[in-house]
Protein backbone atom coordinates (compact mmCIF):
# COMPACT_ATOMS: atom_id res chain seq x y z
CA UNK A 1 0.00 0.00 0.00
CA UNK A 2 1.24 3.51 -0.86
CA UNK A 3 1.36 5.54 2.35
CA UNK A 4 0.83 9.22 3.10
CA UNK A 5 3.42 10.82 5.37
CA UNK A 6 1.24 10.22 8.43
CA UNK A 7 0.70 6.57 7.56
CA UNK A 8 4.37 6.05 6.70
CA UNK A 9 5.60 7.37 10.03
CA UNK A 10 3.03 5.49 12.09
CA UNK A 11 3.84 2.30 10.17
CA UNK A 12 7.47 2.56 11.23
CA UNK A 13 6.37 2.66 14.88
CA UNK A 14 3.90 -0.24 14.90
CA UNK A 15 4.11 -3.97 14.24
CA UNK A 16 0.66 -3.94 12.62
CA UNK A 17 0.22 -3.44 8.87
CA UNK A 18 -1.45 -0.11 8.16
CA UNK A 19 -3.84 -0.61 5.27
CA UNK A 20 -6.41 2.17 5.61
CA UNK A 21 -7.34 5.39 7.36
CA UNK A 22 -9.49 4.78 10.41
CA UNK A 23 -7.52 1.74 11.51
CA UNK A 24 -6.59 1.54 15.22
CA UNK A 25 -2.89 0.81 15.85
CA UNK A 26 -0.55 0.75 18.83
CA UNK A 27 2.61 2.76 18.23
CA UNK A 28 5.90 3.21 20.02
CA UNK A 29 6.56 6.85 20.91
CA UNK A 30 9.82 8.72 20.37
CA UNK A 31 9.08 11.41 22.95
CA UNK A 32 6.38 12.21 25.52
CA UNK A 33 6.05 15.87 26.50
CA UNK A 34 4.29 17.98 29.12
CA UNK A 35 4.57 21.52 30.47
CA UNK A 36 4.01 23.39 33.72
CA UNK A 37 0.24 23.46 33.23
CA UNK A 38 -0.29 19.91 31.98
CA UNK A 39 2.52 17.97 33.69
CA UNK A 40 0.97 18.03 37.20
CA UNK A 41 -2.19 16.44 35.81
CA UNK A 42 -0.12 13.86 33.95
CA UNK A 43 1.88 13.10 37.08
CA UNK A 44 -1.32 12.58 39.08
CA UNK A 45 -2.57 10.13 36.45
CA UNK A 46 0.85 8.46 36.24
CA UNK A 47 0.77 7.72 39.95
CA UNK A 48 -2.88 6.64 39.86
CA UNK A 49 -1.94 4.04 37.24
CA UNK A 50 0.55 2.56 39.68
CA UNK A 51 3.50 3.38 37.44
CA UNK A 52 6.84 3.39 39.24
CA UNK A 53 9.14 4.77 36.56
CA UNK A 54 9.03 6.41 33.14
CA UNK A 55 9.64 4.09 30.21
CA UNK A 56 12.83 5.90 29.18
CA UNK A 57 14.19 8.89 31.06
CA UNK A 58 15.74 10.20 27.81
CA UNK A 59 12.40 10.15 25.99
CA UNK A 60 10.35 12.27 28.36
CA UNK A 61 10.50 16.08 28.21
CA UNK A 62 9.09 18.41 30.86
CA UNK A 63 9.25 22.09 29.91
CA UNK A 64 8.23 24.81 32.37
CA UNK A 65 7.29 27.47 29.84
CA UNK A 66 3.73 28.75 30.22
CA UNK A 67 3.95 30.77 33.44
CA UNK A 68 7.73 31.19 33.54
CA UNK A 69 9.10 32.98 35.46
CA UNK A 70 6.47 31.67 37.91
CA UNK A 71 3.87 34.40 38.17
CA UNK A 72 2.20 33.46 41.46
CA UNK A 73 2.11 30.88 44.25
CA UNK A 74 -0.12 28.48 42.33
CA UNK A 75 2.19 28.37 39.30
CA UNK A 76 5.23 28.02 41.57
CA UNK A 77 3.58 25.01 43.21
CA UNK A 78 2.89 23.46 39.80
CA UNK A 79 6.54 23.81 38.83
CA UNK A 80 7.75 22.51 42.19
CA UNK A 81 5.63 19.37 41.84
CA UNK A 82 6.95 18.75 38.32
CA UNK A 83 10.55 19.46 39.31
CA UNK A 84 10.36 16.92 42.13
CA UNK A 85 8.86 14.31 39.80
CA UNK A 86 11.61 14.90 37.24
CA UNK A 87 14.26 14.40 39.91
CA UNK A 88 12.57 11.28 41.25
CA UNK A 89 12.32 9.74 37.78
CA UNK A 90 15.73 10.91 36.62
CA UNK A 91 14.18 12.70 33.63
CA UNK A 92 17.01 13.95 31.44
CA UNK A 93 15.07 16.64 29.61
CA UNK A 94 13.65 18.82 32.36
CA UNK A 95 13.82 22.53 31.54
CA UNK A 96 13.25 25.44 33.90
CA UNK A 97 14.75 28.86 34.44
CA UNK A 98 17.66 30.04 32.34
CA UNK A 99 17.82 26.98 30.09
CA UNK A 100 14.08 26.92 29.45
CA UNK A 101 12.18 28.25 26.47
CA UNK A 102 8.81 27.88 24.81
CA UNK A 103 8.57 24.11 24.41
CA UNK A 104 7.79 23.89 20.69
CA UNK A 105 10.68 26.18 19.82
CA UNK A 106 13.06 24.69 22.40
CA UNK A 107 12.83 20.97 21.60
CA UNK A 108 13.62 21.31 17.86
CA UNK A 109 16.47 23.68 18.72
CA UNK A 110 17.93 21.03 21.05
CA UNK A 111 17.63 18.26 18.48
CA UNK A 112 15.08 16.31 20.52
CA UNK A 113 12.64 15.90 17.64
CA UNK A 114 13.12 15.13 13.98
CA UNK A 115 11.97 13.30 10.85
CA UNK A 116 10.09 10.05 11.40
CA UNK A 117 9.57 10.56 15.13
CA UNK A 118 6.24 9.98 16.85
CA UNK A 119 5.79 12.67 19.49
CA UNK A 120 2.87 13.00 21.90
CA UNK A 121 2.54 16.08 24.05
CA UNK A 122 0.11 17.39 26.62
CA UNK A 123 -0.19 20.59 24.63
CA UNK A 124 -2.31 21.15 21.55
CA UNK A 125 0.51 22.75 19.56
CA UNK A 126 2.71 19.67 19.74
CA UNK A 127 1.86 19.40 16.03
CA UNK A 128 4.64 21.97 15.46
CA UNK A 129 7.20 19.19 15.00
CA UNK A 130 5.48 18.12 11.80
CA UNK A 131 7.52 20.92 10.26
CA UNK A 132 10.50 18.60 10.71
CA UNK A 133 8.70 15.55 9.36
CA UNK A 134 7.58 14.10 12.70
CA UNK A 135 4.12 12.75 13.42
CA UNK A 136 3.45 14.95 16.43
CA UNK A 137 0.12 15.57 18.09
CA UNK A 138 -1.45 16.96 21.24
CA UNK A 139 -2.92 14.61 23.85
CA UNK A 140 -4.72 15.02 27.14
CA UNK A 141 -2.56 14.70 30.24
CA UNK A 142 -3.92 11.24 31.09
CA UNK A 143 -2.92 9.80 27.72
CA UNK A 144 0.51 11.39 27.98
CA UNK A 145 0.87 9.80 31.42
CA UNK A 146 0.20 6.43 29.79
CA UNK A 147 2.82 7.11 27.13
CA UNK A 148 5.33 8.19 29.80
CA UNK A 149 4.79 4.90 31.62
CA UNK A 150 4.50 2.49 28.68
CA UNK A 151 6.41 4.09 25.83
CA UNK A 152 3.52 3.45 23.49
CA UNK A 153 0.00 4.61 22.78
CA UNK A 154 -2.83 3.99 20.35
CA UNK A 155 -3.88 6.00 17.32
CA UNK A 156 -6.69 5.97 14.86
CA UNK A 157 -4.83 6.37 11.58
CA UNK A 158 -6.00 9.74 10.24
CA UNK A 159 -7.07 10.43 6.67
CA UNK A 160 -4.87 13.06 5.02
CA UNK A 161 -5.68 16.36 3.33
CA UNK A 162 -2.98 17.47 0.92
CA UNK A 163 -2.39 21.23 0.66
CA UNK A 164 -0.20 22.34 -2.24
CA UNK A 165 1.09 25.92 -2.40
CA UNK A 166 2.38 27.00 -5.80
CA UNK A 167 4.02 30.18 -7.07
CA UNK A 168 6.55 32.59 -5.61
CA UNK A 169 5.96 34.34 -2.30
CA UNK A 170 5.69 38.14 -2.63
CA UNK A 171 7.62 40.45 -0.31
CA UNK A 172 6.14 40.48 3.22
CA UNK A 173 4.18 37.27 2.63
CA UNK A 174 5.40 34.23 4.53
CA UNK A 175 4.55 31.07 6.40
CA UNK A 176 2.00 32.67 8.75
CA UNK A 177 0.06 33.98 5.78
CA UNK A 178 -0.01 30.55 4.13
CA UNK A 179 -1.48 28.78 7.13
CA UNK A 180 -3.99 31.58 7.69
CA UNK A 181 -5.04 31.24 4.06
CA UNK A 182 -5.64 27.53 4.50
CA UNK A 183 -7.60 27.99 7.73
CA UNK A 184 -9.59 30.79 6.15
CA UNK A 185 -10.49 28.45 3.31
CA UNK A 186 -11.44 25.28 5.22
CA UNK A 187 -12.41 26.68 8.62
CA UNK A 188 -11.46 25.77 12.17
CA UNK A 189 -12.98 22.30 11.78
CA UNK A 190 -12.06 21.72 8.15
CA UNK A 191 -9.34 19.20 8.99
CA UNK A 192 -10.92 17.64 12.07
CA UNK A 193 -8.89 14.53 12.96
CA UNK A 194 -7.15 14.73 9.60
CA UNK A 195 -3.44 14.93 8.93
CA UNK A 196 -2.53 17.95 6.83
CA UNK A 197 0.31 17.32 4.39
CA UNK A 198 1.96 20.39 2.84
CA UNK A 199 3.91 20.56 -0.42
CA UNK A 200 4.51 22.66 -3.52
CA UNK A 201 7.09 25.19 -4.70
CA UNK A 202 6.16 27.80 -2.09
CA UNK A 203 6.54 25.23 0.69
CA UNK A 204 9.91 24.07 -0.61
CA UNK A 205 11.09 27.68 -0.57
CA UNK A 206 10.25 28.13 3.11
CA UNK A 207 12.85 27.77 5.82
CA UNK A 208 12.45 24.94 8.31
CA UNK A 209 11.36 27.52 10.88
CA UNK A 210 8.65 28.72 8.50
CA UNK A 211 7.43 25.17 8.06
CA UNK A 212 7.18 24.80 11.84
CA UNK A 213 5.01 27.94 11.92
CA UNK A 214 2.58 26.28 9.52
CA UNK A 215 2.63 22.92 11.30
CA UNK A 216 2.06 24.71 14.61
CA UNK A 217 -1.33 25.98 13.46
CA UNK A 218 -2.57 22.73 11.89
CA UNK A 219 -4.61 22.26 15.07
CA UNK A 220 -6.39 25.57 14.38
CA UNK A 221 -8.06 23.80 11.46
CA UNK A 222 -8.77 20.79 13.68
CA UNK A 223 -5.83 18.82 12.32
CA UNK A 224 -4.40 15.80 14.09
CA UNK A 225 -1.00 16.63 12.62
CA UNK A 226 0.61 18.96 10.08
CA UNK A 227 3.32 17.26 8.06
CA UNK A 228 6.15 18.25 5.74
CA UNK A 229 8.52 16.00 3.84
CA UNK A 230 12.02 15.88 5.30
CA UNK A 231 14.20 17.34 2.54
CA UNK A 232 17.75 18.68 2.35
CA UNK A 233 16.80 21.76 4.41
CA UNK A 234 15.32 19.57 7.13
CA UNK A 235 18.33 17.30 7.27
CA UNK A 236 20.72 20.25 7.43
CA UNK A 237 18.69 21.69 10.33
CA UNK A 238 18.67 18.46 12.35
CA UNK A 239 22.30 17.60 11.52
CA UNK A 240 23.36 20.96 12.96
CA UNK A 241 21.70 19.80 16.17
CA UNK A 242 23.48 16.49 16.38
CA UNK A 243 20.97 14.21 14.66
CA UNK A 244 21.48 11.77 11.81
CA UNK A 245 18.22 11.65 9.88
CA UNK A 246 17.21 10.37 6.47
CA UNK A 247 14.96 11.96 3.83
CA UNK A 248 11.28 11.20 4.31
CA UNK A 249 8.34 11.75 1.98
CA UNK A 250 4.96 10.30 1.13
CA UNK A 251 4.85 7.36 -1.25
CA UNK A 252 3.94 8.06 -4.88
CA UNK A 253 0.32 7.14 -5.42
CA UNK A 254 -0.72 7.65 -1.79
CA UNK A 255 -4.45 8.22 -1.33
CA UNK A 256 -5.64 11.59 -0.03
CA UNK A 257 -9.11 12.36 1.25
CA UNK A 258 -8.97 15.84 -0.26
CA UNK A 259 -6.46 17.84 -2.27
CA UNK A 260 -6.28 21.64 -2.20
CA UNK A 261 -4.11 23.96 -4.28
CA UNK A 262 -3.29 27.59 -3.52
CA UNK A 263 -1.38 29.97 -5.80
CA UNK A 264 0.58 32.41 -3.63
CA UNK A 265 1.45 34.74 -6.51
CA UNK A 266 0.20 38.24 -5.77
CA UNK A 267 -0.89 37.34 -2.24
CA UNK A 268 -1.26 40.08 0.32
CA UNK A 269 -0.36 39.54 4.00
CA UNK A 270 -3.33 38.13 5.90
CA UNK A 271 -4.86 38.84 9.29
CA UNK A 272 -7.19 36.62 11.34
CA UNK A 273 -9.86 38.78 12.94
CA UNK A 274 -11.67 38.16 16.24
CA UNK A 275 -12.72 35.74 17.50
CA UNK A 276 -11.59 32.74 15.40
CA UNK A 277 -8.49 31.94 13.34
CA UNK A 278 -10.78 31.28 10.36
CA UNK A 279 -11.92 34.92 10.18
CA UNK A 280 -9.17 35.74 7.71
CA UNK A 281 -8.93 38.94 5.66
CA UNK A 282 -6.20 40.65 3.61
CA UNK A 283 -4.42 43.25 5.70
CA UNK A 284 -5.74 45.97 3.41
CA UNK A 285 -9.31 45.20 4.45
CA UNK A 286 -8.59 45.74 8.14
CA UNK A 287 -6.09 48.57 7.81
CA UNK A 288 -6.84 51.35 10.26
CA UNK A 289 -8.08 49.22 13.15
CA UNK A 290 -6.63 50.87 16.25
CA UNK A 291 -4.45 48.91 18.67
CA UNK A 292 -3.42 48.95 22.32
CA UNK A 293 -0.93 46.09 22.26
CA UNK A 294 1.32 44.12 19.91
CA UNK A 295 2.84 40.74 20.84
CA UNK A 296 5.72 39.27 18.83
CA UNK A 297 6.77 35.79 19.96
CA UNK A 298 5.19 32.42 20.93
CA UNK A 299 5.67 28.87 19.67
CA UNK A 300 4.26 30.06 16.35
CA UNK A 301 6.53 33.01 15.60
CA UNK A 302 9.18 33.40 18.29
CA UNK A 303 12.16 31.94 16.44
CA UNK A 304 15.20 33.83 15.19
CA UNK A 305 13.82 34.23 11.66
CA UNK A 306 10.73 35.85 13.19
CA UNK A 307 12.86 38.19 15.28
CA UNK A 308 14.79 39.20 12.16
CA UNK A 309 11.56 39.85 10.26
CA UNK A 310 10.16 42.06 13.01
CA UNK A 311 13.45 43.92 13.45
CA UNK A 312 13.66 44.64 9.72
CA UNK A 313 10.40 46.55 10.00
CA UNK A 314 11.15 48.22 13.34
CA UNK A 315 14.71 49.34 12.61
CA UNK A 316 14.95 53.13 12.64
CA UNK A 317 11.30 53.49 13.63
CA UNK A 318 9.41 54.03 16.88
CA UNK A 319 6.47 52.19 18.37
CA UNK A 320 3.42 54.46 18.23
CA UNK A 321 2.55 56.39 21.37
CA UNK A 322 -0.05 54.54 23.42
CA UNK A 323 0.87 51.11 22.02
CA UNK A 324 2.63 48.43 24.06
CA UNK A 325 4.84 46.28 21.82
CA UNK A 326 5.99 43.15 23.66
CA UNK A 327 8.74 41.03 22.10
CA UNK A 328 9.36 37.57 23.57
CA UNK A 329 12.15 35.57 21.88
CA UNK A 330 11.06 31.96 22.30
CA UNK A 331 14.24 30.38 23.70
CA UNK A 332 17.50 31.41 25.36
CA UNK A 333 19.20 30.44 22.10
CA UNK A 334 16.99 32.80 20.13
CA UNK A 335 17.55 35.52 22.74
CA UNK A 336 21.34 35.18 22.54
CA UNK A 337 21.39 35.16 18.75
CA UNK A 338 19.08 38.18 18.62
CA UNK A 339 21.41 39.96 21.04
CA UNK A 340 24.46 39.02 18.96
CA UNK A 341 22.84 40.29 15.75
CA UNK A 342 21.77 43.58 17.32
CA UNK A 343 18.07 42.78 17.10
CA UNK A 344 17.47 43.30 20.82
CA UNK A 345 19.01 46.76 20.51
CA UNK A 346 16.70 47.48 17.57
CA UNK A 347 13.67 46.44 19.61
CA UNK A 348 14.71 48.51 22.61
CA UNK A 349 15.49 51.59 20.53
CA UNK A 350 12.08 51.28 18.91
CA UNK A 351 10.41 51.36 22.30
CA UNK A 352 9.50 47.69 22.61
CA UNK A 353 9.27 45.75 25.85
CA UNK A 354 11.64 42.80 25.48
CA UNK A 355 10.88 39.93 27.84
CA UNK A 356 12.04 36.41 28.68
CA UNK A 357 11.39 33.21 26.79
CA UNK A 358 7.84 32.50 27.93
CA UNK A 359 4.38 31.76 26.58
CA UNK A 360 3.17 34.65 28.72
CA UNK A 361 0.34 36.64 27.12
CA UNK A 362 -0.45 34.09 24.38
CA UNK A 363 -2.75 32.14 26.71
CA UNK A 364 -3.65 35.10 28.89
CA UNK A 365 -1.08 33.94 31.43
CA UNK A 366 0.93 37.03 32.28
CA UNK A 367 3.27 39.69 30.85
CA UNK A 368 0.70 41.36 28.62
CA UNK A 369 -2.90 40.79 29.69
CA UNK A 370 -5.64 42.78 27.94
CA UNK A 371 -8.21 44.86 29.81
CA UNK A 372 -11.86 45.37 28.87
CA UNK A 373 -12.15 46.98 25.45
CA UNK A 374 -8.46 46.62 24.58
CA UNK A 375 -7.31 45.31 21.22
CA UNK A 376 -4.09 43.51 20.26
CA UNK A 377 -2.43 42.12 17.18
CA UNK A 378 -0.17 39.14 17.85
CA UNK A 379 2.00 36.58 16.12
CA UNK A 380 0.40 33.89 18.29
CA UNK A 381 -1.94 31.13 17.13
CA UNK A 382 -5.32 31.70 18.78
CA UNK A 383 -7.67 34.64 19.06
CA UNK A 384 -10.65 33.13 20.86
CA UNK A 385 -12.70 35.45 23.02
CA UNK A 386 -10.77 36.11 26.23
CA UNK A 387 -7.65 34.32 25.01
CA UNK A 388 -5.29 37.15 26.01
CA UNK A 389 -7.24 38.49 28.95
CA UNK A 390 -10.64 40.14 29.26
CA UNK A 391 -13.65 38.59 27.55
CA UNK A 392 -14.29 42.10 26.26
CA UNK A 393 -10.90 42.35 24.52
CA UNK A 394 -9.99 41.47 20.92
CA UNK A 395 -7.00 39.72 19.36
CA UNK A 396 -5.96 39.78 15.69
CA UNK A 397 -3.41 37.26 14.39
CA UNK A 398 -0.69 38.12 11.87
CA UNK A 399 2.93 37.62 10.83
CA UNK A 400 5.87 39.27 12.62
CA UNK A 401 6.17 41.80 9.77
CA UNK A 402 2.53 42.88 9.98
CA UNK A 403 2.64 42.94 13.78
CA UNK A 404 5.76 45.12 13.77
CA UNK A 405 4.34 47.48 11.15
CA UNK A 406 1.16 47.79 13.18
CA UNK A 407 3.17 48.64 16.30
CA UNK A 408 4.78 51.53 14.43
CA UNK A 409 1.57 52.77 12.83
CA UNK A 410 -0.60 52.31 15.92
CA UNK A 411 -3.16 50.71 13.64
CA UNK A 412 -3.19 47.46 11.68
CA UNK A 413 -0.88 48.18 8.76
CA UNK A 414 0.91 46.59 5.80
CA UNK A 415 4.70 46.68 6.36
CA UNK A 416 5.13 48.02 2.85
CA UNK A 417 3.04 51.08 3.71
CA UNK A 418 5.42 52.54 6.29
Curated annotation (Swiss-Prot):
Coiled-coil regions listed in the entry: none
Keyword Acetylation found: no
Keyword Protein biosynthesis appears in the UniProt entry: no
Pathway membership, UniProt: Amino-acid biosynthesis; L-leucine biosynthesis; L-leucine from 3-methyl-2-oxobutanoate: step 2/4
EC number, as in UniProt: 4.2.1.33
BP GO annotations: L-leucine biosynthetic process
InterPro entries: Acnase/IPM_dHydase_lsu_aba_1/3 (IPR015931), Acoase/IPM_deHydtase_lsu_aba (IPR001030), Aconitase_4Fe-4S_BS (IPR018136), Aconitase_4Fe-4S_dom (IPR036008), HAcnase/IPMdehydase_lsu_prok (IPR011826), Homoacnase/IPMdehydase_lsu (IPR006251), IPM_dehydratase_rel_enz (IPR050067), IPMI_cat (IPR033941)
Cofactor field: [4Fe-4S] cluster
Keywords attached to this entry: 4Fe-4S, Amino-acid biosynthesis, Branched-chain amino acid biosynthesis, Iron, Iron-sulfur, Leucine biosynthesis, Lyase, Metal-binding
Function: Catalyzes the isomerization between 2-isopropylmalate and 3-isopropylmalate, via the formation of 2-isopropylmaleate.
Assembly, per entry: Heterodimer of LeuC and LeuD.
Name the UniProt record assigns to this protein: 3-isopropylmalate dehydratase large subunit
Gene: leuC
Amino acid sequence: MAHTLAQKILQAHTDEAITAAGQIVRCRVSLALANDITAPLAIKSFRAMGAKKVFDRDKVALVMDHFTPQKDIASAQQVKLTREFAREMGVTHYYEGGDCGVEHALLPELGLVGPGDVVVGADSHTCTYGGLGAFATGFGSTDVAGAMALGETWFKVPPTIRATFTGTLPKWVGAKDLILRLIGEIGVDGALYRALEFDGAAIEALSVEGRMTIANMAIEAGGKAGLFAADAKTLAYTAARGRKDAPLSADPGATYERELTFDVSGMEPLVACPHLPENVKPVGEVRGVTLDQVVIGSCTNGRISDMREAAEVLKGRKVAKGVRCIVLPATPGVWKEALKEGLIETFMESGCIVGPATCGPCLGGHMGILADGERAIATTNRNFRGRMGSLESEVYLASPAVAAASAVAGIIAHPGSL
